[in-house]
A protein has these predicted regions:
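Hydrophobic/aromatic-rich alpha-helical bundle segments in the mid-to-C-terminal region
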Residues: 108-116, 123, 145-192, 200
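Helix-turn-helix
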Residues: 26, 33-61, 65
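Short coil/turn segments at alpha/beta junctions that flank glycine-rich nucleotide-binding fingerprints
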Residues: 29-33, 84-85, 106, 147
Length: 200
């Protein structure tokens, strides 16, 4: 009897993560509104949707947890990047490396984070640019301007120029319009994006 209880609690701990992983994949492939709890249940291999309700009351709660988890992980990664590198150019280069690596290794994460309009189904969520992770990126740009590494322009415009190129490249890779892996375009995208904001 004790062994049965242990097995059930172990599978419960795994199941919440499995629900999140399945939902992430489905949201990224089909979109939030085209994904039902039944789709998530089927992807996880549960018999009924009550297995999903055991962890999350709504599909919106799943999406919110996913977004928070992804943004928390990104924020921690950015902290690591900032500790390892002093210059804004080095920090931005490592963030670009991370985004391109994620696009190749975990495309669902990049799709969900950058290209799915989460404000359509999470209206109360903090706007992406106001989250801790993206505030840190904006601070990197501000510091780069202050240190004279980045042109003296509005920091938000510098963000737009730089990440407009990076994000559009990633979007085209995810859509299949750019046929090779993201890694194949990383160097060229970096040089172009950095060239837009670097102080000459």
């Amino acid at each position: 009897m004790e062994q049965e209880i242990e097995t059930e609690s172990t599978s419960t701990a795994l199941s919440q993560d499995q629900v999140l992983q399945a939902a992430l994949k489905l949201f990224s492939q089909k979109g939030y509104f085209n994904t039902s709890l039944t789709d998530i249940k089927d992807a996880v291999g549960l018999k009924t949707t009550s297995g999903v309700y055991q962890f999350f009351k709504t599909k919106q709660a799943i999406a919110q947890t996913l977004r928070e988890n992804i943004l928390d992980s990104l924020s921690i990664s950015i902290d690591d990047v900032r500790r390892r590198n002093r210059k804004a150019s080095e920090q931005l280069r490592e963030i670009v490396d991370l985004l391109f690596k994620l696009t190749d290794d975990a495309p669902e994460i990049v799709q969900f984070l950058l290209f799915i309009k989460t404000d359509d189904f999470l209206p109360e969520a903090t706007p992406l640019l106001d989250t801790p992770a993206f505030n840190k990126i904006r601070r990197i740009i501000q510091n780069g301007i202050k240190e004279g590494e980045i042109r003296a322009i509005d920091p938000l415009m510098a963000y737009c120029y730089f990440f407009g190129i990076i994000n559009q490249t990633l979007a085209l890779v995810l859509q299949g319009a750019l046929a090779k892996s993201a890694d194949s375009y990383q160097s060229q995208a970096w040089l172009t994006a950095w060239g837009c904001i670097a102080k000459k």
